[in-house]
């Protein structure tokens, strides 16, 4: 079992984030000791890493709550989890397209300035 400080160090998350995630019910496997301090076993640590990854992918807290509440037992739960992940994939693809458009704009600006500098230098 890991204390909140140890779990934060192991996952790279802040203690604040761990408290937030457990308070929002994202880590159902978290336990409490006799002093009501959070304790994280292997299952809770795995859940933390899952939540961390989903957040890094841009998934909302609400979507993660739905995802984690479904569990992994049964075809219906797996299908519902798949739908949540597919929706996130669609969002990520849209964001990637927007980023590529912005990058194209920047590249055109860079080329324009390089051309302008070369023209000024030649004069």
Language model features: what each stretch is:
Residues 7, 14-17:
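Short glycine/proline-centered loop/turn elements that form peptide/ligand docking sites
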Residues 25:
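Glycine-centered, phosphate/nucleic-acid-interacting loop/turn motifs that mediate DNA/RNA or nucleotide
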Residues 28-35:
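Beta-hairpin "wing" of winged helix-turn-helix
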């Amino acid at each position: 079992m890991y204390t909140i400080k140890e779990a934060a160090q192991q996952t790279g998350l802040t203690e604040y984030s761990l408290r937030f995630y457990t308070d929002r019910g994202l880590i159902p496997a978290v336990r409490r000791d006799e002093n009501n301090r959070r304790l994280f076993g292997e299952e809770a640590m795995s859940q933390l890493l899952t939540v961390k990854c989903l957040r890094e992918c841009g998934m909302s807290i609400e979507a993660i709550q739905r995802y984690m509440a479904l569990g992994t037992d049964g075809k219906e739960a797996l299908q519902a989890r798949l739908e949540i992940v597919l929706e996130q994939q669609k969002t990520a693809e849209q964001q990637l397209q927007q980023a590529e458009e912005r990058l194209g704009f920047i590249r055109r600006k860079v080329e324009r300035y390089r051309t302008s500098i070369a023209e000024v230098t030649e004069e």
